[in-house]
């Protein structure tokens, strides 16, 4: 028996930081750069990363290993579900292949942690033929990350599961203890994932700065301002900007939304004294603006990636490279409606 699972990478188009709060929308693009896993029957649990040849073999799921923690957590959650359902299960071998890293092994900031969890859950769903729908697989991903005390918007998990371009809003906090089956069958207040269909063509360029950034630490830093009156006003403004972008009927209004959200992030920087738009990201945006585009940091900022949209195709890769910015060839991942 063999099955494959794919977890798509992600790029935030708009809504970052605000989206960690329930009911605040984000627009997220799932990338065709992804993590693929192949799952096969085995006498022992075996995890293999073909990119760096790392490998671990173990007999039960109580194993602890920092490098493999996201995969092991996803396995644990899925096998608990199998147990609740009374399904027969066995140990498996999982081979991992990723194109979310650079050639020298550095992460590109495309959500590899979320992508690997989604790939495992999708692959196990096919392997054990549970026929779970997309929202149930998303919930399993969230539960597995919750077990690791990972906090955030979980928008990367939604993109990794669904593909396409999505509108996403985070759920209100849910008690993750108890029956997994019950959690899958319970409505999570304010959780929303839906595909966006724009009536105009999108052209974009993605630049990787080569500077790593820690999303968790940056989100935690901003969260300390939750009771600040100016921050609350910014959250309301974020919701307005993103909803207007979601409803865009032409490319110009969409590009204006990108500019507005860049300004929003700049205001957040001033309020929190956190560097989101680094000098390289600023350089990327300036180059794109000169070619009639609208750009911004994507995700937590402070490094990683920036994204810009244009009313027409552009050829600026050589210019970006001359500034030390690596252009990434990225298409939108296919939709996975289940």
Regions found by a protein language model. Give the residues of each.
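C-terminal nucleotide
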Residues: 2-14, 18-21, 28-88, 101-105, ...
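DPxDG-like acidic metal-binding loop motif
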Residues: 109-131
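Conserved phosphate-donor
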Residues: 93-95
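Alpha-helical scaffolds flanking conserved acidic
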Residues: 135-137
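Glycine-rich active-site/cofactor-binding loop and its immediate structural neighborhood
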Residues: 303-305
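Short loop/turn motifs enriched for small/polar and acidic residues
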Residues: 97-99
């Amino acid at each position: 028996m063999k099955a494959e699972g794919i977890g798509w990478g992600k790029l935030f188009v708009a809504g970052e930081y605000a989206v960690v709060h329930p009911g605040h929308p984000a627009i997220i693009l799932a990338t065709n750069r992804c993590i693929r896993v192949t799952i096969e029957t085995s006498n022992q649990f075996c995890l293999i990363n073909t990119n760096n040849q790392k490998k671990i073999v173990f007999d039960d799921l109580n194993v602890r290993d920092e490098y493999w923690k996201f995969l092991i957590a996803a396995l644990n959650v899925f096998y608990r579900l199998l147990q609740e359902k009374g399904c027969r299960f066995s140990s498996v071998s999982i081979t991992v292949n990723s194109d979310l890293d650079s050639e020298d092994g550095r992460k590109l900031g495309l959500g590899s942690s979320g992508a690997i969890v989604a790939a495992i859950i999708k692959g196990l769903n096919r392997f054990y033929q549970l026929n779970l729908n997309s929202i149930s697989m998303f919930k399993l991903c969230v539960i597995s990350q919750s077990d690791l005390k990972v906090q955030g918007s979980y928008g990367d998990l939604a993109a990794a599961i669904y593909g396409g371009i999505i509108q996403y809003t985070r759920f209100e906090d849910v008690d993750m203890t108890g029956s997994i089956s019950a959690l899958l069958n319970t409505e999570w207040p304010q959780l929303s994932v839906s595909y966006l269909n724009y009536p105009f063509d999108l052209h974009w360029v993605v630049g990787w700065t080569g500077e790593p950034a820690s999303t968790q630490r940056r989100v935690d830093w901003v969260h300390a301002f939750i009771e600040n009156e100016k921050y609350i006003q910014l959250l309301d403004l974020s919701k307005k900007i993103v909803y207007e972008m979601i409803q865009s009927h032409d490319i110009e209004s969409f590009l204006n939304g990108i500019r507005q959200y860049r300004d929003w992030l700049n205001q957040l920087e001033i309020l929190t004294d956190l560097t989101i738009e680094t000098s390289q990201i600023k350089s990327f945006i300036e180059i794109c603006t000169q070619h009639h585009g609208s750009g911004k940091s994507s995700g937590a900022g402070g490094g990683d990636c920036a994204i810009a949209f244009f009313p027409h195709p552009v050829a600026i890769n050589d210019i970006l490279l001359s500034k030390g910015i690596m252009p990434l060839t990225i298409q939108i991942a296919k939709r996975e409606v289940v």
